[in-house]
Regions:
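Short, highly charged, low-complexity non-transmembrane loops/tails of multi-pass membrane proteins
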Residues: 140-152
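General structural signal for secondary-structure boundaries
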Residues: 16, 49, 110-111, 142
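Hydrophobic cores of alpha-helical transmembrane segments in multi-pass integral membrane proteins
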Residues: 20-43, 48-79, 83-107, 114-137
């Protein structure tokens, strides 16, 4: 189920955004790991952690998420195009739940509710990241096929 034509693959591979994504996506994953670890340690009282660090962790995770999403808008203006629709919908849902954490914190929700909301935000990130990875694998297989056929 490839989505890219040979012309689109050439454009994608030449895009600055592709390079930015290759650098920032793993950094975002490490922020996710740190955030989910802190959230879990706090939620289960494994160690004494000030709730401030839960918010800082999701803040940095959200900032990297936003940088990746915004750079996709800036470089090549590909947001919500047919080729990237599901990735962008997934990113929008994940962004909503990441930002919802801060809205709920501002509204004064208790820490236990914010911990659950942080888990939901992290879960939407994982679902979104998994669908990205599946699509990348499919596209890499398609790209190999197109190279063998001489279309690239």
């Amino acid at each position: 189920m490839p989505r890219y034509t040979p012309e689109q693959l050439i454009k994608r591979n030449a895009s600055v955004w592709t390079d930015v994504q290759i650098i920032l996506a793993p950094i975002q994953f490490f922020f996710f790991l740190g955030g989910i670890t802190l959230n879990t340690l706090y939620a289960y009282h494994v160690v004494q952690i000030d709730f401030f660090w839960i918010s800082i962790a999701i803040l940095f995770k959200t900032l990297f998420f936003a940088i990746l999403f915004i750079t996709g808008m800036i470089f090549d203006h590909w947001v919500y195009t047919p080729e990237f629709l599901w990735e962008d919908i997934g990113s929008t849902v994940a962004a909503f739940f990441h930002l919802l954490y801060f809205v709920m914190a501002w509204m004064g929700y208790p820490e236990n509710v914010l911990v659950v909301e942080a888990y939901i935000a992290y879960m939407t990130y994982i679902i979104n990241a998994l669908q990205y990875l599946i699509r990348i694998i499919l596209e890499k297989n398609n790209e190999k096929k197109l190279r063998v056929q001489g279309h690239l």
